[in-house]
Amino acid sequence: MTTTAETVRTAGAGRDRWEALALARAARLEALLGDPYDPANPHGLRALFAADHRRTPPAATEALLDGAGLAAEFVPVEYGGRLTRADLLARTLRPVFRRDVALGFGYGITSLFATGPVWAAGTPDQRRDLAELLLGGGRATILHHELAHANAILRDEFTARPAGQGGLRLHGRKDLIINAARADAQIVYARTDAARGPRSHSVFLLDPTRTEPGTMRHLPRIETSGMRGALFSGLEFDGRTLPEDALVGRAGEGVALALRTFQVNRSVICGVVTAAADTVLHSAVRAATTGRSGPVARRWHKPLTGVFADLLACDSMATVALRALGLLPDRAHVLAAAVKYVVPDLLRENLEELSTVLGSRGYRHGSPEYGALDKLVRDLPVAGLGHAGTAACQAVIVPQLRTLAESAWFAEDEPPPELFRKGAELPPLDYRLLGIAGGGDFMAASLVGSADRLAPSRGVGGQITALAELAEAFVAELRALRETCRRLPPYGTSVLGDPAVCVLSDRYSLIAAAAAVLGVWEGQDGTDPFLADAAWAVLALSRIGERLGIPVPELPDGCAAYVLDELVRRYRAGLSCDLDATPLAQ
């Protein structure tokens, strides 16, 4: 890949132009990929499903993405790429994930996840060389247990041991690494201290072409049940010399770098995978409307409107977390874990609901119109969106709960309104500024502020009264959670093994989701009448409240019908079912 005019424009643009340029690139990519339902489109769903069935990457579409310079999206603008803000990155990548999660991971987003430690703590030479590699069409891969699980690097899969003549040698094996056989850079988390603790691991940036004979062995490809077109295989190291310039950051900084950079990975994953669920929702609306001259059958109203509201809630939560990475970089780590905790669970539930609408159509595996459900059900767990990821997020959230209850909830100031305001100019994502300790809880403060502002509307009636009552119900739940969390044992005890304690992270994360919905609704400027109306927020909050088991008011008259009308309108107009209502290729 060579430097493109778009890359040059991004590098020279001010913050006021970043969003417009990113949305233009996303629109161009959507157009290049073409109508996903056209059977003759080499980048359409039929072709992508066929590649998945063959268990091969879609070569033609990867070549198209190469030509579009997509790899530049993973390189910070200061090093010649297009990466400015995390929320804009997610919006740029959605056209790819809307069609195929495996393509999104296999083509390049893994490079973003792998290179985070280098952008956070690498030397100027490491950053420059890595940027040059990615901009030239190269790939990077990450070597630890899972793509997105911060706790998994603590397992002794790789060790860097002192060599007799000085320096370190890498040992260990991992059987399941995405792009292991075709990566041009390897970012390895290896144990460098036998003692357990936060200084046990270090990060190394390796060039696979600089390996001595006999010290690195490629292991066979492993076929997975999901993301079948992605290339998973293994690597085994037996005394591979680690050059002095391979260490990223300081020795023993690996765990801290993982915790800092994985908050980007978690938020980006959730920000893009909603686009894949959007495709399934479009399939369900197609199933519910095809062959009908009248309105959608009543039995499908609840699953269709409910999933639509959930997708808007997921997008709200992910977008707020992504924006916080730039605006509040030292305070976003708990929210990022909460997003990764909530969004996959909601999406799994949504797919189950949509399967009832699709019925037997959902088993037409190769059908572009209806095959997305089956594929996404298989892809999500392999993409790190299964139950193991939930445990990793609990490991981030639970240790913070007592401190937040004692010092942050109902005591902290609200975040800047730009966090929720569409079109606001925000600082860039700077990996070097990301924090992992303390920082309070700006989402809880936002929830309390939203409820206070809505309180005078509780007697007005209609949607706004329902919204005010829901906001107050979530504040009451936060208050109850505070009392429970104040009684937790101090950090460092074995509370993570207690199921009752882990449930608290579920309650907290759903409260954070509600805060995001309210914040995004309040941040509307009126340019989108649907999002400015309270109906979608009322429905989204009602579903979150039902999951929490808190009192939920009856939906006001016309609420669900208004949301359903918007969903059908978007389907017929070819618009996405997220906060952006993006025009889709047709």
Positions of the model-derived regions?
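A short core secondary-structure module
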Residues: R173-R217
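Glycine-rich beta->alpha junctions and the first turn(s) of the following alpha-helix
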Residues: T224-L312, R421-A516
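Extended amphipathic alpha-helical segments with heptad-repeat/coiled-coil character used for oligomerization
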Residues: A321-P417
